């Protein structure tokens, strides 16, 4: 059971890193979001959610 949790945690981390890399590559050519857009908050919110889920699974 512990090994399965660790595999899931590693898989989520790899997916998050891949998602971040793809979004950074796309952001190079994209225009900046408008000041009223909350698009810049999507990545920190995603990492906070993943960290919370990982903490719940591990502890």
Swiss-Prot record:
Example of a GO cellular component annotation carried by this entry: side of membrane
PTM: Contains 4-hydroxyproline; hydroxylated on Pro-31, Pro-33 and Pro-35. O-glycosylated on hydroxyprolines; noncontiguous hydroxylproline residues are glycosylated with arabinogalactan.
Regions annotated as coiled coil: none
Glycan attachment sites: 31, 33, 35
Membrane topology term: Lipid-anchor; GPI-anchor
Localization of this protein: Cell membrane
GPI-anchor amidated serine lipid sites: 37
Propeptide stretch(es), residue numbers: 38-59
Cleavable signal peptide: 1-27
Keyword annotations: Cell membrane, Glycoprotein, GPI-anchor, Hydroxylation, Lipoprotein, Membrane, Proteoglycan, Signal
Residues annotated with 4-hydroxyproline modification: 31, 33, 35
Family: Belongs to the AG-peptide AGP family.
Task performed by this protein: Proteoglycan that seems to be implicated in diverse developmental roles such as differentiation, cell-cell recognition, embryogenesis and programmed cell death.
Protein name according to UniProt: Arabinogalactan protein 13
Organism name: Arabidopsis thaliana
Gene from which this protein is expressed: AGP13
